[in-house]
């Protein structure tokens, strides 16, 4: 599993952080232990280690580079990944056909920029988790729960 985070705000957008935590080896040498309480300090260290013009592995399994949202989505699409964008007008996640190796795209509390959202519609299937508004962390938990249910039934 990988987590992609994009930071599009000032002072120097867009930063792409890719996280593919290393699970084997000794903590502190081959890998880092990432607890919920450590997330902000780890992200701060990763952002600090950014160097213009290079994709840099800051910790084992944690990279940072300058890359925009549409560029990343395009790369994932070209690799054959199935992209899903969360949209209140999308198909309900409970009935949607979620294909193997999915990537879910969600914005912050403001949503995605309208221009990027329009372009992403051509690459992504639009899905919704329901009629209510949730925090991003809740959305991630709901999507993971739905994927777990499908995996348990052999549907993924």
Give each language-model segment a name.
Residues 93-108, 114-117:
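Strongly charged, low-complexity linkers/loops
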Residues 10, 90, 110:
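Short, glycine/serine-rich, charged loops/turns that create anion-binding
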Residues 75-81, 97-101, 122:
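Flexible, charged surface loops at secondary-structure boundaries
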Residues 88-90, 94-101, 144-149, 153:
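Catalytic cores of processing enzymes, dominated by hydrolases/peptidases
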Residues 106-111, 128-132:
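Glycine-centered small-residue hotspots that permit tight backbone geometry or close packing
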